């Protein structure tokens, strides 16, 4: 409406959070410093009107300087310590009027643990200086460690594929990119292990030409023992040890009987004899097939059977015995009695007296041929015709004349 005053208005500013008192100082410390300054000014010249006007002018200049400091303060200014020339402005900021800071809604900002107060209420930054980042060392070539624990074999850097996009002809960049650092670049290269699982090839033997040898130091993990262990486990070594032990026992018995001066020559002669016998036994034994079979037959256990001789242990009372044979008549009579027992006929059976003849059981013709050339239905045949057919003999199958139509 025209003539109506607008109650509120707004404007666009560059920093909308400019008036939120975003500083790190404690407002209570600022108030305390302002009170101390007032007391000092009041003690110097007891309150005239000139002193009051001077105090008000100083407070106004201090508030203006504090507003400018709050607007221009940034994150870099907080991290870096201020030069001593700015300390004068900080003192002026601390002498703000207490009425402006007692408004409601102002957030109390506490000091951080790395800051301390001096006696006059000034904040001191005691944060440790940050050390600069480490530099990567590209000049020093990586050395690989050999078995002996010394870095003796140098592997050239060119042989290793450089990770990332830009490599020497490898990766995405190709030759044109050169030594450029790409995504996932790592100057250390791929880690090469001394041993690979399931193979006897070590990483440095491929480049240095050294031959791989198993770990046989006699101690530690994944150890295959020493060369002396194999000699001690061989049967020849065990046999020698047994012979040496026996010779030592014999030597000890001889030394008890003989004086001390004669101990060594007796032991030496016995050892020499044992060595000569061992040399003779070591050669392979050769024999013929017959000799080998003879040795096998000696070792084989012979099986002996207790075989009874004929008529051995026979009783004399059975010498006159003979075999009894049944007569044929008795066998035939026995068979007839068995048949009569199973197939017994009654007395009034007349089946044996009847004669049974099987005639032609085919159906008779239902009609004959008509007299006028047509096929007519004949009458019923006479009863006498059946007797004629039954009395007629069957044709001979083997006679070709009986079947003239087939001829």
From Swiss-Prot:
It comes from the Eukaryota. GO terms for molecular function: mRNA 3'-UTR binding; ribosome binding; SUMO binding; translation elongation factor binding; translation repressor activity. SMART domains: HABP4_PAI-RBP1. One of its GO terms (cellular component) is nucleus. Keywords: Acetylation, Cytoplasm, Isopeptide bond, Methylation, Nucleus, Phosphoprotein, RNA-binding, Translation regulation, Ubl conjugation. GO terms for biological process: negative regulation of translation; PML body organization; ribosome hibernation. The modification N6-acetyllysine is found at residues 52, 68, 122, 140, 211, 328. The keyword Acetylation applies. The modification Omega-N-methylarginine is found at residues 165, 188, 216, 363, 366, 369. The modification Phosphothreonine is found at residue 226. It is found in: Cytoplasm; Nucleus; Cytoplasm, Perinuclear region. Phosphorylation by MTOR inhibits SERBP1 and relieves ribosome hibernation. Residues 70-80, 89-114, 122-162, 183-199, 261-274, 327-341 have a biased composition (Basic and acidic residues). Residues 51-68 have a biased composition (Low complexity). There is a cross-link at residues 102, 211, 228, 280 (Glycyl lysine isopeptide (Lys-Gly) (interchain with G-Cter in SUMO2)). The modification Phosphoserine is found at residues 25, 197, 199, 203, 205, 208, 221, 234, 329, 391, 393. Pfam families: HABP4_PAI-RBP1, IHABP4_N. Residues 164-182, 362-371 have a biased composition (Gly residues). Residues 242-256 have a biased composition (Polar residues). InterPro entries: HABP4/SERBP1-like, HABP4_PAIRBP1-bd, IHABP4_N. Associates with mature 80S ribosomes. Interacts with EEF2/eEF2; interaction sequesters EEF2/eEF2 at the A-site of the ribosome, thereby blocking the interaction sites of the mRNA-tRNA complex, promoting ribosome stabilization and hibernation. Interacts with SPIN1. Interacts with CHD3 and TDRD3. Interacts with ZDHHC17 (via ANK repeats). Ribosome-binding protein that promotes ribosome hibernation, a process during which ribosomes are stabilized in an inactive state and preserved from proteasomal degradation. Acts via its association with EEF2/eEF2 factor, sequestering EEF2/eEF2 at the A-site of the ribosome and promoting ribosome stabilization and storage in an inactive state. May also play a role in the regulation of mRNA stability: binds to the 3'-most 134 nt of the SERPINE1/PAI1 mRNA, a region which confers cyclic nucleotide regulation of message decay. Seems to play a role in PML-nuclear bodies formation. This is SERPINE1 mRNA-binding protein 1.
